[in-house]
Amino acid sequence: MGERKVPHVRKIDLEDPLDGTLRGHVRAMGYTDFDMARPIIGVCNPWSELNPGHWHFRALGDAVKRGIWAAGGFPLEFPTISMCEVFHDISTLIYRNLMAMSTEEMIASMPIEGVVLLSTCDKDVPAQAMALATVNKPAIIVTGGTRLAGYYQGETVACSTDTQRFTWEYKAGTIGECEMREVEMNGFYNTCGACGVMGTANSVQSMAEALGLTLPGCASIPAVYAQRIHMAEATGRQIMRLVQQDVRPSDILTRAAFENAIRVQMATGASTNLVIHLIAIARRAGVDLTLADFQRISEATPFIADVKPCGSVTVEELYHAGGIRAVMKTLAPLLDMSVMTASGQTLAENLEGVEVRDPRIIHPLSDPIQSSGGLRIVRGTLAPDGAVVKTAAASPHLLRHTGPAAIIRDARTADGRAGSVSQEEIDQDFREITADHVIVSRYLGPIGAPGMPERGPMGLPTHLLRQGVRDMVRVVDCRMSGTSYGTVVLHVAPEAAVGGPLAVVQDGDMISLDAQAGKLDLLVDEREIQRRLAAWTPPLPAYRVGYRSLWLDQVTQAPEGCDFHFNVDPEWREKQARRA
């Protein structure tokens, strides 16, 4: 896509008598000419009391600014939206693109020479990475870290992986309300920070470090540790070096860096959401990343970090074993060690002297937990453009399975978006299904829901839970929380709402999954599939005005990263004009 542009930076002129308006506005906030003589550094801080992952960002932001002042800069802090999936009434993937656009416009248009970005959660880290890749001013991320583990009856527990497990046991009748209340109050939610497993939030923080966008060791430090404050202050100092040395995101976000990040994803059993996010970031950086890259790298990368949900320990325990740095040190023979990072050094230099402190948690390459990365891309008549299976979180006996389809009802709210399906409705609809059925959930994709909510591991019927069934094959066009587990075929593309074959599956149709062979097929004659598709009509759009309408008009499909067409396709307007 050619060389990345170097953006113009407007600076405060202390001598020009006609530039007094800008100087005056800065003085109005209490700053002086002495301050304005320094390089202005933006501090992007999405602090919010509607996001426990960002609740501690006032302290982290102050630490970043201390570092900038100490290194000779002039920090000016600005906010953006802040997203926690639990608080929103709609999938926060919709707002990833909004946060990316607002962040990139602030960075691009303000008189700042570099920027430090604070983020913790599922969509915030990718949004900021998309923004800094687009603007290409010197930038560095400091992540918020993981919350501490909880304890319940002598067991280490963490949300939301263990939340899912306890919820199913409650529905099966093996534990009662008192136990559910106790583990909620005393086990899952002890501190601020990301959910304490390798869910999407900790996965994207690890992704940022693996890409080289943070200082070494940043990803795994728990949110409430003093070392997290120290890291924030060091990041403030480091942005000044990046500005002075003119190190830009385009120097860091190379194809090799993205392949390194995918390897770390596979080695840690990280969230499948990284497939969407890494593709989106890569395309902003001019790197053509595809599902085939994930398949190729997964096959050649062992799963070595025994961290939940695919393993047995929390991210706090992973930190004490050496963290993501130690994972990358172990993976060194498989990584491109020459890549530049935000430390101003190569990855090889960053990892000098790093050791694994607990090989029971971070396994050596000679003794992996699994020989491959635990993610498969499947294609076939049900997913012509591909789908994703997290085999590391699946039941091995279900990864090759053929069974009849059982279609879950398409619940909608009054305004037309996807609603939740209650356990009672699941029990009513599925009262006669067996564990051999394949549960199908559709119209939950980027456009259909809209926003691809994390509904992949939808609930199982109570009669099967009471029989001891805890997993079934599920096929969906939505996403799955990185904290979840189960045999779920995700991100089916094209999605049902745009006329993918998933839209015309009928109850009782046989569906065949062979994850190892990379196949997902609807065992219906091709002529019958085409007949059904010809008779199919698309659903009406849920929104006709506002930002959500823009999302519906512009979002790409999952294999393209769910970014907006106009952000990644320079010829989009011409293509639209030709169609008209």
Segments (PLM) and residue ranges:
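Short, well-structured alpha-helical segments in soluble
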Residues: 98-110
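Catalytic or ion-coupling anion/metal-binding cores of large enzyme and transporter domains
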Residues: 2-55, 60-81, 86, 92-95, ...
